[in-house]
From Swiss-Prot:
Signal sequence, renumbered to the chain: 1-26
The species this protein was found in: Gallus gallus (Chicken)
Record's protein name: Neuronal acetylcholine receptor subunit alpha-10
InterPro entries per the UniProt record, alphabetical: Neur_chan_lig-bd (IPR006202), Neur_chan_lig-bd_sf (IPR036734), Neur_channel (IPR006201), Neuro-gated_channel_TM_sf (IPR036719), Neuro_actylchol_rec (IPR038050), Neurotrans-gated_channel_TM (IPR006029), Neurotransmitter_ion_chnl_CS (IPR018000), Nicotinic_acetylcholine_rcpt (IPR002394)
Location of this chain's protein in the cell: Synaptic cell membrane; Cell membrane
Gene expressing this chain: CHRNA10
Keyword Secreted tagged: no
Length: 452
């Protein structure tokens, strides 16, 4: 008999493979069912899977930070989305993979096997839900790996002393709730948490997530209890607070010294100070609402309080200076020390000059630089005639003229006195304006320096 052609042989082999493939898959399924039945025939998930009950079972933990959902500074609670991986060896669930068609691993519900009761010690969730019920990966050598996502709420001590330029350290402490260190040896797989799949947060920047293993002995028990603590290093993104809270405060605080530059007769000097004070009070309330009620005052809060104190002082000084400005003709003369210090030295230093005066020349002590001199007929006693042809017998007329001249002199003296007090007020306004400008500048530099 002649041999069959080569194409016919290839077609027959391909058809045979097509027919046998479903049969192989069905065989694998039957072997997997048989494996599952054989493994859990006499298995109890309530007992710790250790061949020697005197030895501790090694459990490794690795946490992956996926997202920071919320940081509640007022209640001091951090809400985060984590992927928690736990791995251990269950000697009761090992099999020979050659006896089961080469099956090396299976995925089964986590409720089928024993699981370590690893919980978040500093949990702040009222429901205390824990991890999701996900499958575990069981390998032929008995190693079990359990990956489960979890949304955790952990307590975090928030220090707002340098808000909005602050950084926080939030700890996530994982440990067994009932097993001590002689029964479960909990260790971290890596020295840091995994941040490769982290979704960036708009408010917080994650600087790192180091992991440390601690062994703690509590007062209730003599056995040691190991735990793994992940420290989440956070730094606040301050741009939002700079543009919405800090810069408006700086600009408003620079308005306070300008109140001294307003003319005293405008009637708006005190109104400006009170308006600025009310605006800062509103911003202070906005900061207080978002901060936890603690003893530590935030940096921006200190800046607000210092600015409000400065504006209060400037408003009080404005009222005092306005009282000097409007003292009127009946006021006493300017004291010599005030005339020398304010009208001479400070006025020249601050270039506060009246019309026709020069800031470089000192004023004369007698007149204080106010008004023209007495005309040449004043100061002559009534009754004396400057010329020989004076009609001295008109005593009544001369007496009246002398009286009018005296009233005019007293009126001019009162006017000069009031003008001097007005200039004193103007010099003090200019002096305090520069003093408060310097104070605002120094406070702003201090805030920026502390932030750096």
């Amino acid at each position: 008999m002649g041999s069959a052609p080569l194409p016919a042989c290839l077609l027959a082999l391909s058809l045979a493979g097509t027919v046998l493939a479903p049969g192989c898959g069905a065989a694998q399924g039957r072997l997997a069912h048989k494996l599952l039945h054989d493994l859990f025939a006499n298995y109890s998930s309530a007992l710790r899977p250790a061949e020697d009950t005197e030895r501790a079972l090694n459990v490794t933990l690795q946490v992956t930070l996926s997202q920071i959902i919320d940081m509640d500074e007022r209640n001091q609670v951090l809400t985060s989305y984590l992927w928690v991986r736990q791995a251990w060896l269950d000697a009761h669930l090992a099999w020979d993979k050659d006896a089961y068609g080469g099956i090396d691993s299976i995925r089964i519900p986590s409720s089928y096997v024993w699981r370590p009761d690893i919980v978040l010690y500093n949990n702040a969730d009222e429901r205390f839900g824990g991890s999701m019920e996900t499958n575990v990966v069981l390998r032929s050598d008995g190693h079990i790996m359990w990956d489960s996502p979890a949304i955790t709420k952990s307590s975090c001590k928030v220090d707002v002393s340098y808000f909005p330029f602050d950084g926080q350290q939030c700890r996530l402490t994982f440990g067994s709730w009932t097993y001590n260190g002689n029964q479960i040896d909990l260790r971290n797989l890596l020295d840091t948490g995994d941040l490769t799949d982290f979704v960036e947060n708009v408010e917080w920047e994650v600087l790192g997530m180091p992991a440390t293993r601690n062994v703690v002995t509590y007062g209730c028990c003599s056995e040691p209890y190991p735990d793994v603590t992940y420290t989440l290093l956070l730094r606040r993104r301050a741009s939002f607070y700079i543009f919405n809270l800090l810069l408006p405060c700086v600009m408003i605080s620079f308005l306070a010294p300008l109140g001294f530059y307003l003319p005293a007769d405008s009637g708006e000097k005190v109104s400006l100070g009170v308006t600025v004070l009310l605006a800062l009070t509103v911003f202070q309330l906005l900061v207080a609402e978002s901060m936890p009620p603690s003893e530590s005052v935030p940096l921006i809060g200190k800046y607000y309080i210092a600015t409000m104190t400065m504006i209060t002082a400037s408003t009080a000084l404005t009222i005092f200076i306005m009282n000097i400005h409007h003292c009127g003709p009946g006021a006493r003369p300017v004291p010599p020390w005030a005339r020398r210090l304010i009208l001479h030295h400070l006025a020249r230093a601050l270039c506060v000059c009246e019309v026709g005066e020069s800031c470089g020349r000192p004023q004369r002590e007698g007149t204080g630089g106010m008004g023209p001199r007495d005309p040449p007929g004043e100061g002559v006693e009534p009754g004396l005639c400057p010329r020989s042809r004076c009609l001295c017998h008109h005593h009544a007329v001369l007496s009246s003229v002398g009286y009018i001249a005296g009233v005019f002199r007293r009126h001019r003296t009162a006017q000069r006195r009031a003008a001097e007090w007005k200039k004193v007020a103007k010099v003090m306004d200019r002096f305090f304006m520069w003093v408060f400008f310097l104070m605002v500048f120094l406070m702003s530099v201090l805030v920026i320096g502390k932030a750096a």
